[in-house]
């Protein structure tokens, strides 16, 4: 199909312009033109400034605080669950690749009805057309509803958000109503703004009928509406650590009413350097809270966090704790040079375009994201880019275009992509291999979600040879084809999975909405939709 008209002349510029990051909406085409101006913070992780956040927050002496009692155990085991033999329970857990640890772990449920959710949640589940709970939900719901601290390890796209959101609704409805000046009852920490918004969307769906209010607090967006939400009172606050600490330090909210704490994608939050902020936030929450920690992996750093913050916790792992890929994703690795990548990409896009599938292309840097997007759009491909230096309004627009299928090709950096909830991505292309194989697993986990099949293509160069051995192990475990060149690299190349993740630098400011100027701005090509005479004819 071809795209015509529609966007009347103005795409966004997005080039690396000189100057001071010009403000204001530019004239003419109205696109985003500004480059990266001088100074300022380059967006980093979800817009949160790392700095010395939390210095103004004092630890609370909880021993001398008068704390109101609260209820957190709401679980009544369904008679059908009780009637199952131990052998049946073990067989079900084995079938779902479910491993448990801890004392007195509740039995898993097998249907939504067995969870014992109230009618206002069950009606929403039925309306959304879910047929059966996912593996993580079968075990995590009884654990969470029983009021226990829990650790849940499961791959991205496994239904983790619903696993903690629905018990949160039950928890809130059993607590006293918020009084003026009260902070939230449920706090959900997430690494990125995209994941925070995704969680908020699910909380809104299931909280409407019981009038549970929520807000998402994250950097890169105006503080005003977020402050208003907090001051009016919300039962659920979904937040990235940096912006939340900002709100706490300036007295815009407090965490004295929090009795249900969730840390989602805990491994990623630690990777991104948020541990000091997380520790400062948790110090502001009463120690007898219920704490739930969700993570895709279980490295030592996450284990230490769990030991410090959770009490007598129970744990469920879905699948192996070894680094394994989603088996619903067909993995294809091609060993090549950097010079070969563009031609390989075009070849794969030609093939994929016959199926009208959505494609997520991962690149290493913001510059590559912008340059490659420009190259693809000049060649007629409907591609857009998302990364940490883009304004929030632009990121939201790009994501909406991708989700709707109007622009079915999206380029992304790792930080921008984590937590993106686009369920019908058919293909992932690793244009640049990530720093380590853990990120490779997360990347290809963007496709093959919710039981669907997906495909990944990965371009692997000599510069990536340190990761060859671990990648071969992942491919072998998935029964995927292993290129001979990759096996050779694994035999003779470096050991381990490559260097650790970088912290993401302080880029030169954000740049404003300009008029398409600046060196390399794309308002006349790469990212602009042609107006007037019917736009460009897409290859899609």
UniProtKB/Swiss-Prot annotation:
The name on file for this protein is ATP-dependent RNA helicase DBP2-A
Enzyme class, broadest EC rank: hydrolase
Compartments it resides in: Cytoplasm; Nucleus
PROSITE patterns (alphabetical): DEAD_ATP_HELICASE (PS00039), HELICASE_ATP_BIND_1 (PS51192), HELICASE_CTER (PS51194), Q_MOTIF (PS51195)
The Helicase C-terminal domain sits at 344-490
- Please give the Gene Ontology molecular function terms for this protein: ATP binding; ATP hydrolysis activity; mRNA binding; RNA helicase activity
- Which UniProt key words apply to this protein? ATP-binding, Cytoplasm, Helicase, Hydrolase, Nonsense-mediated mRNA decay, Nucleotide-binding, Nucleus, Ribosome biogenesis, RNA-binding, rRNA processing
Keyword Zinc-finger tagged = no
**Subunit notes for this chain?**
Associates with polysomes.
What EC number(s) does the entry state? Answer: 3.6.4.13
Instruction: Present the record's domain note.
Output: The Q motif is unique to and characteristic of the DEAD box family of RNA helicases and controls ATP binding and hydrolysis.
Q: Where is this region: Disordered?
A: 494-540
Q: Which Gene3D superfamilies match?
A: P-loop containing nucleotide triphosphate hydrolases
Q: Can you give the residue ranges of the Helicase ATP-binding domain?
A: 141-316
| Gene name as annotated | DBP2
Q: Indicate the principal place this protein occupies in or around the cell.
A: cytoplasm
| Reaction(s) this enzyme catalyzes, per UniProt | ATP + H2O = ADP + phosphate + H(+)
């Amino acid at each position: 199909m071809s795209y015509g008209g529609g966007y009347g002349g103005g795409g966004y510029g997005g080039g690396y312009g000189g100057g001071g990051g010009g403000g204001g909406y530019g004239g003419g085409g109205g696109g985003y033109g500004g480059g990266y101006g001088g100074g300022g913070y380059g967006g980093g992780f979800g817009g949160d400034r790392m700095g010395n956040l939390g210095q103004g927050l004092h630890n609370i002496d909880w021993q001398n605080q008068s704390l109101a009692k609260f209820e957190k155990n709401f679980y009544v085991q369904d008679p059908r669950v009780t009637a199952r033999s131990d052998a049946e329970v073990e067989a079900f857990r084995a079938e779902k690749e479910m491993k448990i640890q801890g004392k007195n772990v509740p039995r898993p449920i097998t249907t939504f009805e067995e969870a014992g959710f109230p009618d206002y949640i069950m009606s929403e589940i039925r309306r959304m057309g879910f047929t059966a709970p996912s593996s993580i939900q079968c075990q995590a719901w009884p654990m969470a509803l029983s009021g226990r601290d829990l650790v849940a390890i499961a791959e991205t796209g496994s239904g983790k958000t619903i696993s903690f959101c629905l018990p949160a609704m039950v928890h809130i409805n059993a607590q006293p109503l918020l009084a003026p000046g009260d902070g939230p009852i449920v706090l959900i920490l997430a690494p990125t703004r995209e994941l925070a918004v995704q969680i908020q969307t699910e909380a809104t769906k299931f909280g409407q009928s019981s009038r549970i209010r929520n807000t998402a607090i994250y950097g890169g967006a105006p503080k005003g509406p977020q402050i208003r939400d907090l001051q009016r009172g919300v039962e659920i606050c979904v937040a990235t650590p940096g912006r939340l600490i900002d709100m706490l330090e300036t007295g815009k909210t407090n965490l004295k009413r929090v009795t249900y704490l969730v840390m989602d994608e805990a491994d990623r939050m630690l990777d991104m350097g948020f541990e000091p902020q997380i520790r400062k936030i948790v110090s502001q929450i009463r120690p007898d809270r219920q704490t739930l920690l969700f993570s895709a992996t279980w490295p030592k750093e996450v284990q230490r966090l769990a030991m410090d913050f959770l009490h007598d916790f129970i744990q469920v792992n879905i699948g192996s704790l070894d680094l394994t890929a989603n088996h619903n994703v067909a993995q294809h690795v091609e060993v090549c040079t950097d010079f070969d990548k563009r031609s390989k990409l075009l070849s794969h896009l030609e093939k994929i375009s016959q199926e009208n599938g959505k494609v997520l292309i991962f690149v290493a840097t913001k510059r590559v994201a912008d340059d490659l997007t420009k190259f693809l759009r000049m060649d007629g491909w409907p591609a857009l880019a998302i990364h940490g230096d883009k304004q929030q309004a632009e990121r939201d627009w790009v994501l909406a275009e991708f989700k709707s299928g109007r622009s079915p090709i999206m380029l992304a950096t790792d930080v921008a992509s984590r937590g993106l909830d686009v369920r019908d991505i058919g293909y992932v292309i690793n244009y640049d291999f990530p720093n380590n194989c853990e990120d490779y697993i997360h990347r290809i986990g963007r496709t093959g979600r919710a039981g669907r099949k997906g495909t990944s293509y990965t371009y692997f160069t000599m510069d990536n040879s340190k990761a060859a051995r671990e990648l071969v192990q992942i491919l072998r475990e998935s029964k995927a084809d292993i290129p001979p060149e990759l096996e050779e690299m694994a035999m003779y190349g470096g050991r381990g999975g490559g260097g650790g993740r970088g912290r993401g630098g302080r880029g030169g400011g954000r740049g404003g909405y300009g008029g398409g100027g600046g060196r390399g701005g794309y308002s006349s090509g790469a990212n602009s939709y042609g107006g007037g005479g019917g736009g460009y004819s897409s290859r899609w």
